[in-house]
Amino acid sequence: MNNLFICYTPFHLNMAFSIIKKMKYKSNILVYLPSIGNKKNKYYYKQSKKYYKITYSKIIKLSYIKDFIYIHNLAKQIKDVNIFCAGNLKTMYSRLLLSLIKHNRLCTFDDGVGHYYKSPYFANTKEKIIGRIFLRKNFYYSSLLSKVKLHFTLYPNKNIKHKTIKLDYNSVCDS
């Protein structure tokens, strides 16, 4: 069965590849959803494609309606995976895909930067109106946190409550 990696930035692409190497995951699918189309995003996506069985990419946030349709169509193609691994579980795109794709295990990964801010983006679990409209309550960010089975991070200190695997910064940057 396939493993699915949802990435939003070039750094996410590198982290996902580091996870694949460290865990020796086989048969992986990449969904890359950058918010802008530039040379850097295209370059890293092109470099990453060779490590995945199937890849998908779309620039998001240009039209939420088109994005919503794209995510639904994408979920119909992927259907089910063993591991669902998201670089940012809080975004609507990750949670919408998660609600539509059958999976056995939920994993997350981050660079740890959010832990250095006084009021981090990820600490706010209040659901935005768009999430309340499009997602069932069990796919609200606050509900999903307890379902994460494994979390990969660069952050050296206590992170989240789930089983955490620390990635070495150099292994990510050398990907």
Where is each model-derived feature located?
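Active-site and donor-binding regions of nucleotide-sugar-utilizing enzymes
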Residues: L4-Y155
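Loop-centered beta-sheet repeat module
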Residues: S142-S175
